[in-house]
Amino acid sequence: MINKIKILFSFLALLLSFTSYAKAEDLHDKSELTDLALANAYGQYNHPFIKENIKSDEISGEKDLIFRNQGDSGNDLRVKFATADLAQKFKNKNVDIYGASFYYKCEKISENISECLYGGTTLNSEKLAQERVIGANVWVDGIQKETELIRTNKKNVTLQELDIKIRKILSDKYKIYYKDSEISKGLIEFDMKTPRDYSFDIYDLKGENDYEIDKIYEDNKTLKSDDISHIDVNLYTKKKV
């Protein structure tokens, strides 16, 4: 078993050992963000909402799926989608939710406190027989660092879940949302086996409030986990920008 693990890690290291081509000048700088934006980004990516195997038959405003008493501490949970079709897709289905949640400007459903979340929803029945390990290649100023690993047991996983997991690692290890940390720019790229790839500029936040930061996930973009090749992360320090 140990030998198999060593072979897996060696293969990942070989697979991910190509050169980074991301350009720092094309990315947003952390110095552009307010203290509030950095604090909210830290909170959103370090403390995700996670719930499995819950069901709702209630839709509000056509696009919001309502889970009574299923939020943290028994709050009502409002899951917001970009379209009514997405809300209908998950109505009356057992679902898993993994995402960044917020309270400010979350519309109340009842007398309970309401907790909101954009997307982050997958069907509970669609699980892998064996956990999938995805390698994340990290460069700082073009110098390759230790490969990070994220895991999922889902056949179809939201881009939000993967993004949160890798940003949590980067937050812990490189302090990306600390104002005084040396990292000033960054790009996360999800490299697929299919023609299309996906990327996030770490400091391209769409506002300083949590409900603004999280809105990029309302499309509930979902990837087949078997189609994900690996993740590339390019970080840049102030001295290199």
UniProtKB/Swiss-Prot annotation:
Keyword set includes Metal-binding: yes
Keyword terms, alphabetized: Disulfide bond, Enterotoxin, Metal-binding, Secreted, Signal, Superantigen, Toxin, Virulence, Zinc
Cofactor(s) recorded in Swiss-Prot or TrEMBL: Zn(2+)
GO cellular component: extracellular region
Disulfide bonds, paired cysteine numbers: C106-C116
Location of this chain's protein in the cell: Secreted
Major location category of this protein: secreted
Signal peptide, first to last residue: 1-24
Phenotypic consequence of D227A: About 22-fold reduction in host MHC class II binding
GO terms for MF: metal ion binding; MHC class II protein binding; T cell receptor binding; toxin activity
Cofactor note: Binds 1 zinc ion per subunit. The zinc ion is necessary for interaction with host MHC class II molecules.
Gene3D superfamilies: 2.40.50.110, 3.10.20.120
Residues given in the record as Zn(2+) binding sites: D191, H230, D232
Membership in a protein family: Belongs to the staphylococcal/streptococcal toxin family.
Function: Staphylococcal enterotoxin that activates the host immune system by binding as unprocessed molecules to major histocompatibility (MHC) complex class II and T-cell receptor (TCR) molecules via their alpha domain, in particular TRAV27. In turn, this ternary complex activates a large number of T-lymphocytes initiating a systemic release of pro-inflammatory cytokines. Also causes the intoxication staphylococcal food poisoning syndrome. The illness characterized by high fever, hypotension, diarrhea, shock, and in some cases death.
Subunit structure: Interacts with host MHC class II molecules composed of alpha/HLA-DRA and beta/HLA-DRB1 chains. Interacts with host TCR alpha-chain TRAV27.
Protein name: Enterotoxin type H
Annotated organism of origin: Staphylococcus aureus
